[in-house]
């Protein structure tokens, strides 16, 4: 994953994902409506960098993590929106969660893909950068 180098304008930093997990769920709101919940956790190391500066400093790591979280959030949000608005298809299997978790609701609906297309998305992304995978900082 490539993000901006906060210490050198116009330069990039690549993050090598070393660990990741994702959870998806359907939430039932107080008003009886459903929503999509996706939680993503990832860890990574700084792979390559363009430009100069110490990217592993305590001041810079949070900036990189924030950028990484926003990048992942934007990509996931875009993918879900495509499935909902363009393809109108639940390619993620949220309908199966509804069927298992809310069987009575499932029995009452007729067109899941139509319902899926209108569900709000709640997305939580946590990205941790552990350090540098580079042999040396230059």
Where are the model-predicted features located?
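Active-site environment of non-heme Fe oxygenases that use a 2-His-1-carboxylate facial triad
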Residues: 1-138
């Amino acid at each position: 994953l490539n993000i901006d180098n906060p210490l050198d304008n116009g330069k990039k930093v690549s993050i090598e994902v070393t660990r990741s997990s994702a959870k998806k769920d359907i939430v039932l709101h107080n008003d009886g409506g459903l929503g999509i919940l996706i939680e993503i956790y990832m860890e990574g190391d700084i792979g390559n960098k363009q430009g100069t500066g110490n990217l592993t400093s305590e001041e810079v790591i949070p900036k990189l993590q924030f950028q990484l979280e926003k990048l992942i959030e934007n990509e996931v949000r875009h993918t879900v929106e495509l499935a909902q608005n363009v393809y109108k298809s639940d390619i993620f299997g949220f309908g199966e969660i509804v069927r298992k978790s809310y069987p009575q609701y499932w029995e009452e609906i007729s067109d899941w893909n139509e319902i899926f297309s209108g569900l709000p998305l709640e997305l939580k992304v946590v990205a941790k950068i552990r350090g540098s995978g580079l042999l040396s900082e230059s």
